[in-house]
Design a protein with these regions (language model features):
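N-terminal core-binding DNA-recognition domain of tyrosine recombinases/integrases
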Residues: 6-93, 109-113
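DNA breakage-rejoining catalytic core of tyrosine-based enzymes
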Residues: 27, 76, 89-108, 160-168, ...
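Basic, Lys/Arg- and aromatic-enriched nucleic-acid-binding interface segment
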Residues: 55, 78-136, 140
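Conserved tyrosine-mediated DNA breakage-rejoining catalytic core shared by Y-recombinases
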Residues: 83, 131, 140-177, 193
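Catalytic-site neighborhood detector that most strongly recognizes the C-terminal catalytic loop/helix
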Residues: 97, 156-160, 256-281
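Active-site/catalytic core of tyrosine-dependent DNA strand-transfer enzymes
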Residues: 103, 168-226
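Short, basic (Lys/Arg/His-rich) helix/loop patches that form interaction surfaces
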Residues: 114-116, 181-183, 213-254
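Short, polar N-cap/turn motifs at the start of nucleic acid-interacting alpha helices
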Residues: 145-153, 226-227, 247-266
Length: 284
């Protein structure tokens, strides 16, 4: 992700200022520079009919500067990012969490009705759910050296956060199922010798994520599940289940690689409304 950001900044400084990005220092990350970069991304997004990953790239740049500030590198001024306003903030999102009963149905679906690749998709989704809602890109890039005896410790690719999910027996079983079938030191057979660059790996993750969602749609139709489930649902579902079970939000956040505020704002969803209503009827 950071290599991709570097390429973006190289293209930006060359096009906007006719200068090489290698000639820039942290002192050059002024408000004017940041606003110009944001505007450049917006213009390109308009031309391409998308948002050009505006918020994600601005947040990546801020994360780089924050790490530099922690290391006391000269010229970093985090206050400059305030000029970006809402451009650097994620829009309000709706949690895609589903009840644990829905996840259980998917876990117990008749696998003989799915192809070998579709079974991999189901396993990747369930593994994500069992490991703190691990993001698709992190599941695909997971390597065996990050797996400890009782937990997984990894740096999230999209955000500069460390996640430490407990390693459940169900997650272990899924990993061991694919042991020896993957390229290099990867846990799952997602990448091959052809995926030699960050760009190729990113494309591969997008491709398998789309196909995984299609497999989940197929499973939902077979199981008569009404919810629209995607890979993203695993994260919210794990967090909601753990919080509803009374676990400390800080512990849950550490497993997911988020802050307690973030898990409540973006991922938690009350999936037990009927149960709570029954309890309230008894209480009142």
């Amino acid at each position: 992700m950071y290599v991709y950001l570097k390429r973006e900044l190289q293209a930006f400084t060359k096009e906007k200022y006719e200068k090489a990005f290698s000639s820039y220092f942290f002192t050059d990350s002024t408000e004017e520079f940041l606003l110009d970069f944001a505007f450049w991304l917006k213009e390109r997004g308009i031309r391409n009919g998308n948002k050009a990953g505006l918020t994600h790239k601005l947040r990546l740049l801020r994360a780089v500067c924050r790490q530099a500030e922690k290391k006391e590198m000269y010229g970093v001024n985090m206050d400059n990012f305030l000029c970006l306003g809402d451009d650097i903030n994620w829009p309000e999102t709706t949690s895609r969490a589903v009840p644990e009963t829905v996840i259980a149905k998917i876990a117990n679906v008749d696998r003989t009705l799915f192809t070998k690749k579709e079974q991999l998709h189901l396993d990747l989704f369930l593994f994500s759910y069992y490991t703190g809602g691990m993001a698709n890109v992190d599941v695909c890039n997971l390597t065996w050296d990050l797996v400890q005896e009782d937990r997984i410790v990894y740096e999230r690719i999209k955000f500069p956060k460390t996640a430490k999910p407990e390693l459940l027996s169900k997650a272990k079983a899924i990993m061991n199922k694919y042991r020896g079938q993957s390229y290099g030191n990867y846990v799952f057979p997602v990448f091959t010798h052809k995926h030699t660059t960050t760009s190729k790996k990113t494309t591969r993750v997008k491709q398998i994520s789309t196909r995984l969602s299609q497999t989940l749609t197929k499973a939902c139709k077979m199981l008569r599940i009404k919810e629209n489930i995607t890979w993203y649902s695993a994260r919210g579902s794990f967090i909601s289940k753990m919080v509803d079970a009374g676990n400390n939000p800080y512990v849950v956040a550490e497993m997911a690689g988020n802050s307690p505020l973030t898990i409540y704002k973006h991922y938690y969803k009350n999936t037990k409304r009927e149960e709570i209503k029954r309890q309230m009827e008894e209480m009142f």
